């Protein structure tokens, strides 16, 4: 079985350079990186998983996850997935802590502070799109604590990755389905959305409304925001229907509220 040392010797570089290329971290000359990868493929190099486990076990990694509140069916399933993966990570001496908070920037900042005090090594968060949170994520990056945005993104910060959907496109797709249901007839629609603080909600609405504008027979007569609250959503939607009996269709941009 080929080793990193053998690859380094054949490429005429250090083992550290090979490690950076294999793990895609740090800056390596593109020609050198290509040469290393050609050697890797030629030798059919496979990482020593036993060695990785032993190395990881010395680190005692702690990961933190911040999700939106209890009782949200979508995030209940996300939590189940995290717990399932946590079992796989146990052999790497990695533990995962989950905090559930409301759609509130201050609560998210408090959860981050608690994680930092507990010595967390990395954080995944479903963030509000708030400059205060963006600045805190930048601070974490400078401290060597990487942050991944989960399900909804945040603008203008140093989060290292976003795991989620193209919400603008999903909104546009919903508009296309509305057009099919309207059957080219004059149609009045209402919009129910969650929170203006959550980027995936605002992106869905932007994609939806921009696409609807190209369908001249469809008019948006009202948009309501339920602050991600079931009871508020019920009351406001009921009021919407009373005030606008001409509505034919309602677009609910946050389907987790339907239970």
Where are these regions (language model features)?
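Amphipathic helical "hinge" segments at domain boundaries
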Residues: 48-106, 110
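Single conserved hydrophobic/aromatic residue that forms the stacking wall/gate
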Residues: 251-259
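Short beta-strand elements in bilobed, periplasmic/extracellular small-molecule ligand-binding domains
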Residues: 87-105, 191, 212-231
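Short, solvent-exposed amphipathic alpha-helices that sit
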Residues: 74-89, 170-174, 199-217, 232, ...
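N-terminal helix-turn-helix DNA-binding module of bacterial transcription factors
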Residues: 1-53
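Hydrophobic alpha-helical segments within soluble ligand-binding/sensing domains
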Residues: 163-187, 233-234
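Flexible loop/hinge segments that line or gate small-molecule binding clefts
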Residues: 130-169
């Amino acid at each position: 079985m080929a080793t990193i040392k053998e690859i380094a010797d054949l490429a005429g570089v250090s083992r550290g350079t090979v490690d950076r290329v294999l793990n895609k971290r740090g800056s390596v000359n593109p020609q050198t990186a290509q040469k290393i990868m050609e050697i890797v493929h030629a030798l059919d190099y496979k990482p020593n998983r036993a060695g990785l486990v032993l190395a990881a076990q010395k680190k005692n990694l702690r990961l933190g996850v911040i999700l939106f509140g209890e009782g949200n069916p979508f995030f209940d399933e996300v939590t189940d997935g995290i717990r399932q993966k946590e079992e796989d990570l146990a052999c790497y001496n990695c533990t995962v802590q989950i905090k559930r908070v409301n759609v509130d920037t201050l609560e998210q900042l408090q959860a981050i502070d608690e994680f930092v005090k507990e010595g967390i090594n990395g954080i995944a968060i479903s963030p509000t799109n708030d400059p205060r949170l963006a600045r805190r994520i930048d601070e974490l990056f400078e401290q060597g604590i990487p942050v991944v945005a989960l399900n909804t993104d945040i603008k203008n910060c140093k989060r290292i990755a976003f795991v989620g959907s193209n919400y603008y496109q999903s909104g546009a797709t919903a508009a296309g389905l509305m057009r099919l249901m309207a059957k080219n007839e004059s149609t009045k629609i209402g919009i129910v959305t969650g929170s203006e603080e959550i980027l995936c909600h605002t992106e869905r609405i932007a994609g939806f409304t921009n696409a609807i504008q190209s369908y001249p027979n469809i008019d948006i007569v009202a948009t309501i925001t339920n602050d991600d609250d079931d009871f508020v959503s019920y009351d406001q939607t009921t009021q919407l229907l009373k005030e606008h009996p001409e509505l034919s269709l309602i677009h609910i941009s946050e389907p987790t509220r339907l239970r």
